[in-house]
Amino acid sequence: MGKMFDALQKVQREKYVEPADEVQSSVPEDSVLDDKLVSVFASSSMITEQFRRLRTRIFRPGMENPPRIIMVASAMQGEGKSFVAVNLASIISLELHSYALLVDCDLRNPSVTRWFGLQAKKGLSDYLIGEAEIQDLLIKTPIDKLSILSGGSIQGNPVELIGSNKMKTLIQDLKS
């Protein structure tokens, strides 16, 4: 496969835990996860069920070529894109037992790492400006098979970074 797949496999091997039979038990008890991760803390709630429905609509049963990349976006701050992204990624990794990489592309206000009780000094923006290699930036979350790439350090030109050729190459690498 590609470099991205190899990097994800390496991150998973470093902290791999055998898949658990129940969703709740696949998250370590000592994790400092945000309580808004309803897909983890309220696995039988109506909200979590809506994330399951969304997941099923994206990954329809019998689909020959399921999507490799899903983007969650909004026009304004505070509309819930991080809430949707972290819960959808959690449901995918927990219930489909599929590897998932959640990339925080909000370079103005990166927040994904905080949802998982993690910190990252560098991330996507640092990769895009050439100050870090992607394999050094992937972070394993407390949720089995879910890794994240944080937004990184705040840069003055987030629109240009997201539209850069390096970002396009990263997206192509993620698809492979």
Predicted regions and their residues:
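P-loop NTP-binding module
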Residues: M1-S176
